[in-house]
Design a protein with these regions (language model features):
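Transmembrane-helix bundle segments that line or gate the permeation/cavity pathway
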Residues: 1-351
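Long hydrophobic segments that form regular secondary structure
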Residues: 360-367
Length: 367
């Protein structure tokens, strides 16, 4: 924002003063080098300018990841041993690395690889040499053929043929494969119904992002409720110092995990409070964030979707929808905006990878 602030947009008077100096780069010379190029990072002035923001954000990231790691330790036994979730996505790397599984001797595997490689080669040649015929397998928009009201309210409706997606789909349980396309069609029918009834004049109707947010929160609540006995025993053991839990084979002791969560959460709270966010909003923000994290991790462990985006439905977006932005105030809105980078979408959310790593270690008898 410091780069693009102008007298016309009035950013300087509106919110720039609320951005912490220790988390941002303001030096015009350094910013010019970053945006325009023809410069180098390796000067004393540039390195010192970047040092504080990089170190501070690194501290924040490490605390965030550490809390997730401790949380996965608490969840692991309940989901892996008690509920016996399948972790569909760990099977492929385990089979690839196993000497006992004749993975690369499967003729159907090589036939599938040959088809995918042939398609990619043809498409690549078509891009480089347009005279080579290409295959019409990407982004056929059905909306181009549906022009009658209210059916044309479906909007962009792509049909694509991606071999890698078909291969990953083979790893997914049938109920997830079904729900993936069913709810896509259901969403499009919601748009048609809204157009038919005239509800499409309502901004953002039918509130798909909010529906998705509610679904993830529901998955989180279900996961916590189904493991309530296990989690209560962990808390009892933490507060009393004794219990019947056997955590000798866990990645870390349960008491250590709970204590680590508390310490990591304290670091996050102090950090964000220093940024300028109100105390109550800090707990709401991270409560929503970690609830979404648990929901995403549960879905990945049980069903294994390779992508779990949640655009515009993280706490940085949901909170201003639930609470009047004018009541939140500029300082809180600025800090929420600075949290956008790890809440834009959750396709590469680290917590599922952490739990899948524990599952792979268990299957491979590591640790």
């Amino acid at each position: 924002p410091f780069r693009y602030a102008t007298p016309e947009n009035k950013w300087a008077s509106m919110f720039l003063d609320y951005i912490p100096k220790w988390l941002s780069v303001r030096d015009p010379e350094v910013l010019n080098g970053y945006y325009q190029g023809a410069s180098t990072l390796y000067t004393k002035h540039t390195l010192l300018t970047w040092a504080t923001p990089v170190l501070m954000w690194s501290l924040f990231i490490m605390a965030l990841l550490f809390v997730m790691l401790c949380l996965t330790v608490i969840l692991r036994k309940q989901w892996t041993e008690h509920e016996k979730l399948t972790y569909p996505l760990v099977h492929l790397p385990l089979d690839l690395s196993s000497e006992k599984t004749p993975f690369f001797k499967n003729r159907l595997l090589w036939a599938g690889i040959a088809v995918a490689v042939a398609i990619d080669l043809i498409q690549g040649m078509h891009v480089l040499y347009p005279s080579v015929p290409g295959l019409k397998i990407k982004e056929i928009n059905l909306a181009d053929f549906i022009t009658t009201y209210p059916w044309n309210a479906i909007g962009w409706c792509p049909v694509s043929f991606y071999p890698f997606a078909i291969g990953l789909g083979a790893l997914l349980p049938l109920d997830l494969s079904f729900s993936s396309w069913f709810f896509f069609i259901f969403w499009k029918l919601e748009l048609v119904l809204a157009a038919w009834k005239g509800w499409n004049e309502i901004p953002r109707f039918p509130y798909v992002n909010e529906q998705s947010f509610g679904a993830y929160m529901g998955i989180c609540l279900f996961a916590i409720w189904s493991g309530r006995k296990h989690f209560s025993r962990i808390l009892t053991s933490f507060f009393t110092g004794h219990g019947d839990l056997d955590d000798a084979s866990e990645p870390m002791r349960y008491r250590t995990a709970v204590l680590g969560m508390i310490i990591g959460a304290a670091v996050l709270v102090v950090f964000v409070r220093a940024m300028g966010m109100a105390w109550w909003l800090i707990f709401v923000f991270f409560g929503i964030y970690f609830a979404l994290s648990v929901g995403i991790t549960r879905m990945r462990a049980e069903l294994g979707p390779p992508a779990h985006d949640l655009h515009a439905a993280g706490p940085d977006s949901i909170i201003p929808m639930l609470i009047n932005p004018a009541k939140l105030g500029t300082p809180n809105l600025v800090v929420l905006s600075m949290m956008f980078w790890f809440n834009r979408a959750y396709r590469a959310h680290p917590m599922p990878f952490q739990l899948e790593g524990f599952k792979m270690a268990e299957r491979a008898s590591i640790g």
